[in-house]
Amino acid sequence: MSAIIQAFKDADLRKKIFFTIAMIVLYRIGAQIPSPGVDYATISGRLRDLTQDQSSVYSLINLFSGGALLQLSIFAIGIMPYITASIIVQLLTVVIPHFEELKKEGQSGQAKMMQYTRYLTVALALLQSSGIVALADREQLLGAGIRVLSADRNFFDLIVLVITMTAGAVLVMWMGELITEKGVGNGMSLLIFAGIATRLPTDGMNILGNSGGVVFAVVLASVLILVIGVVFVEQGQRRIPVQYAKRMVGRRQYGGSSTYLPLKVNQAGVIPVIFASSLIYMPVLITQIVNSGSLEVSDNWWQRNIIAHLQTPSSWQYIVLYFALTIFFSYFYVSVQYDPAEQAENMKKYGGFIPGIRPGRPTAEYLGFVMNRLLFVGSLYLAVIAVLPNIMLDLGVDAGSAGATPFGGTAILILVSVALTTVKQIESQLLQSNYEGLLK
């Protein structure tokens, strides 16, 4: 508690914390403001009766937006266009030499890639908002025949609605970047954190009201065990000893110190889960738009397979695909973000070496070997956490209403991971000011 008080006594850190809180509050306010032409009363009444199966196509995406998607607020599509754009740009660094060169150019290259990500975000936001509005106009967003837009709407009203939701997605992207730049923690992750956290009280009361006190107590106990397990794994790391050789500069002696290189078990964080969920969401949305807003049986074979296998998260095809995509993005994201050869070269440049391992290529191979072993465990851990709620649904465990997912494995993983990362960043700034760390 004293450390938290000290954090607010630091003028610079206090300013960053208040700025972050202000941005999150503005984001949550925007998530509750209906877009123009939306029948909010009808949506509110319909969402209370929406079942898990009916909302399955959008459940995780709606969770990330804090319920804004199915309410058709001005922030309805939230950060999903930005996440999808980030996936595409990261993939381009592997397949297109120009993007690979940009990645190697350091800060200037990263700035250029960020610019490409922003442009692509606007395009994807326009595409996704058009799809959502098309479904709403056909009265298929919340079920067949459910009207969520005003009855006297015209084409111009739909255009305004698309522009509003697109502008909202761009504004959310800007707010996330501002938090990262001027606040504490990762802005996009904190916005997802806020969206999930705001759903917890309401959905907890829904579980208590629908299933009774015994089930509610079991859910709380399960969540507590899950939180402990997630914290344990997220804090786990492999510490590789590093020795720095002594060297003389003039009459001064430098080096000779010992330290370690920390490699986390879950090096990728929550990014693979978010990537995988957004990638599964896109073909279902496109199929629903192409198929005149309906998820009924289609004559087209690819539409028929998507409808049969990806419409319901409890199907084993959905579970296997989600599991595989999470593992794939774990390996892909770490391979993009962490380069053992670059790490080994930096160590060699400053006179560092791993005892028993020769500097240069042998060090890079050793780091790659250790990282692959850790990544195997970490990716399996992420995949199991991600599909755990889906397996429970497949076994017949009723998750309640559409909003019960904040108590699922993915939501808990995101909440705990973002909280730990943010606290560690605050702690590092406290340590710079000679304050006691928050984690002590």
Curated annotation (Swiss-Prot):
Identify the keywords attached in UniProt to this record, alphabetized.
Cell membrane, Membrane, Protein transport, Translocation, Transmembrane, Transmembrane helix, Transport
Q: Which InterPro entries match?
A: SecY (IPR026593), SecY/SEC61-alpha (IPR002208), SecY_CS (IPR030659), SecY_dom_sf (IPR023201)
Q: Which PANTHER family match?
A: SECY/SEC61-ALPHA FAMILY MEMBER
Q: Which domain of life is it from?
A: Bacteria
Q: Where are the transmembrane segments?
A: 17-37, 74-94, 116-135, 155-175, 178-198, 213-233, 270-290, 316-336, 374-394, 403-423
Q: What is this protein called?
A: Protein translocase subunit SecY
Question: Pfam families this protein is in?
Answer: SecY
GO cellular component terms? plasma membrane
Q: How does it assemble?
A: Component of the Sec protein translocase complex. Heterotrimer consisting of SecY, SecE and SecG subunits. The heterotrimers can form oligomers, although 1 heterotrimer is thought to be able to translocate proteins. Interacts with the ribosome. Interacts with SecDF, and other proteins may be involved. Interacts with SecA.
UniProt membrane topology term = Multi-pass membrane protein
What is the residue range of the signal peptide feature?
none
Summarizing the function annotation, the protein's role is: The central subunit of the protein translocation channel SecYEG. Consists of two halves formed by TMs 1-5 and 6-10. These two domains form a lateral gate at the front which open onto the bilayer between TMs 2 and 7, and are clamped together by SecE at the back. The channel is closed by both a pore ring composed of hydrophobic SecY resides and a short helix (helix 2A) on the extracellular side of the membrane which forms a plug. The plug probably moves laterally to allow the channel to open. The ring and the pore may move independently.
Query: Can you list the disulfide-bonded cysteine pairs?
Result: none
Q: Where in the cell is it found?
A: Cell membrane
Principal subcellular localisation of the protein: membrane
The Gene Ontology biological process annotation of the record reads: intracellular protein transmembrane transport; protein targeting; protein transport by the Sec complex
**Organism of origin:** Corynebacterium glutamicum (strain ATCC 13032 / DSM 20300 / JCM 1318 / BCRC 11384 / CCUG 27702 / LMG 3730 / NBRC 12168 / NCIMB 10025 / NRRL B-2784 / 534)
What family name appears in the similarity comment? Belongs to the SecY/SEC61-alpha family.
